[in-house]
């Protein structure tokens, strides 16, 4: 029997068991196509399934866990959503028209086929619809919207985005893809070394998720605190590779337990020049972002050696970085320079940007090298110059109103990737190979077949 079938059976069994259970064992291995993922409760206790995170606090049956599932790396995967549709005929609480359907207008969810069509983006790409209006003082206007599902309103834009994982949140420098739940930029974001602002941001996110996604009244302060406390206990990472074995074996430091002791503060190892002052220690940038598998560099195991080679590629493969809004257009930075994956993924052994630095690398551009034909196209016009631009997601610009922020989103944490395909904020990369192909095309970087296989093995081991 194929591994994928076995994994699906295990996941189905887990869904049944957890529906009747009050907790998950700490460090329970959960299968994915590359091996097994584990979540570690930093309190070294079972992971409770009875708190506010798992309770339906709204009116549509949803809880936080509807879109942040342990088996999917605490987000949702396309395959996981498809399984839930199959098991419930599309009646699981994740399938709700307020934001789970492609549009909330002119849809028919009275039949299984109707629901399959209405929720096609959620099923195929794991996407939730995010509806936002322009800030009153926006530097641009919406000239037109071409949405294949309806929702063509120019005053309320519908974007389609992947839910971010509700684990490893202690490492965040920005909350949400567009930073809309983060402290306003007029104040220092999540100050070093105090995480109080992060906790406040997560509390606000929990409130907005309950009133929005769950269509409920604002949760009580006690419920919000319970959700945030729960989220902050979770550390998730790939723990076992089906070829290389345990990822903390042979002096390697993979897996979630080691991750729990990883040092982090906002600005740690920031890749911007020291003159920007983003790293409060003033330390120079270290391009060796990951050292999890240094001990495997000379391993006699071909699988372990491959993972170690992939780590080296991530840390050192030269990439010409140009045309990236948020980097190349920043005063004091060159229009083009040679960097690495770590230029944008600089947080040690975590892999996101350690400061709040939304970027536009081209994922939302209409000429993206990946298939984005399923996304709407927004034509935006600069109010001052008359310049127009087309994008599939205005990103951060819908929060700040700034023309320069169009298309910018944050880079996500890279741990637990194997359990949460598809990738990028719009789900346009179905596989990690698609991610690599995007970078090959967008940044004109060449990977040999061996380098691609090595890099994928490494990313799957995070």
How would you label these PLM feature ranges?
Residues 4-14:
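Bacterial N-terminal signal peptides
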Residues 15-20:
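Sec/Tat signal peptide C-region and signal peptidase I cleavage site
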């Amino acid at each position: 029997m194929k591994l994928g079938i076995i994994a699906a059976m295990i996941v189905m069994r887990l869904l049944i068991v957890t529906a009747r259970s009050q907790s998950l064992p700490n460090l329970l291995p959960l299968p994915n196509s590359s091996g097994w993922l584990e979540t570690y409760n930093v309190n070294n206790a079972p992971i409770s399934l009875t708190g506010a995170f798992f309770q339906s606090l709204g009116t549509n049956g949803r809880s936080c866990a509807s879109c942040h599932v342990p088996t999917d790396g605490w987000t949702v995967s396309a395959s996981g959503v498809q399984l839930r549709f199959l098991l419930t005929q599309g009646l699981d609480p994740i399938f709700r028209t307020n934001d789970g359907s492609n549009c909330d207008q002119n849809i028919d969810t009275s039949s299984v086929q109707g629901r399959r069509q209405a929720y096609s983006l959620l099923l195929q790409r794991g996407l939730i619809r995010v509806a936002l209006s322009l800030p009153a003082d926006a530097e641009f206007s919406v000239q037109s919207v071409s949405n294949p599902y309806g929702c063509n309103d120019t005053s309320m834009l519908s974007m389609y985005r992947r839910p971010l994982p509700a684990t490893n949140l202690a490492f965040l420098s920005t909350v949400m893809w567009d930073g809309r739940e983060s402290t306003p930029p007029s104040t220092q974001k999540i100050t070093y070394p105090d995480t109080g602002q992060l906790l406040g941001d997560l509390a606000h996110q929990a409130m907005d998720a309950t009133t929005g996604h769950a269509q409920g009244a604002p949760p009580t302060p006690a419920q919000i605190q319970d959700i945030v406390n729960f989220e902050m206990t979770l550390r998730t990472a790939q723990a076992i590779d089906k070829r290389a074995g345990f990822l903390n074996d042979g002096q390697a430091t993979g897996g979630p337990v080691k991750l729990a002791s990883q040092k982090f503060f906002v600005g740690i190892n920031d890749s911007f020049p020291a003159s920007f002052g983003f790293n409060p220690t003033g330390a120079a940038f270290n391009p060796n972002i990951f050292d999890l598998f240094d001990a495997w560099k000379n391993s006699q195991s071909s699988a372990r050696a491959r993972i170690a080679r992939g780590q080296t590629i991530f840390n050192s493969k030269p990439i010409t970085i140009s045309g990236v809004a948020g980097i190349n257009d920043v005063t004091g930075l060159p229009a083009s320079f040679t960097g690495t994956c770590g230029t944008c993924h600089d947080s040690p052994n975590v892999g996101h940007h350690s400061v709040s630095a939304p970027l536009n690398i081209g994922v939302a551009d209409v000429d993206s090298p990946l298939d984005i034909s399923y996304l709407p196209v927004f034509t935006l016009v600069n109010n001052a110059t008359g310049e127009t631009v087309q994008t599939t997601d205005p990103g951060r610009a819908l929060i700040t109103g700034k023309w320069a922020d169009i298309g910018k989103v944050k880079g996500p944490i890279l741990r637990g990737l194997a359990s949460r395909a598809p990738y990028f904020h719009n789900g346009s990369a179905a596989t990690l190979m698609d991610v690599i192909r995007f970078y090959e095309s967008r940044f004109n970087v060449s990977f040999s077949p061996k380098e691609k296989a090595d890099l994928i093995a490494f990313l799957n081991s995070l």
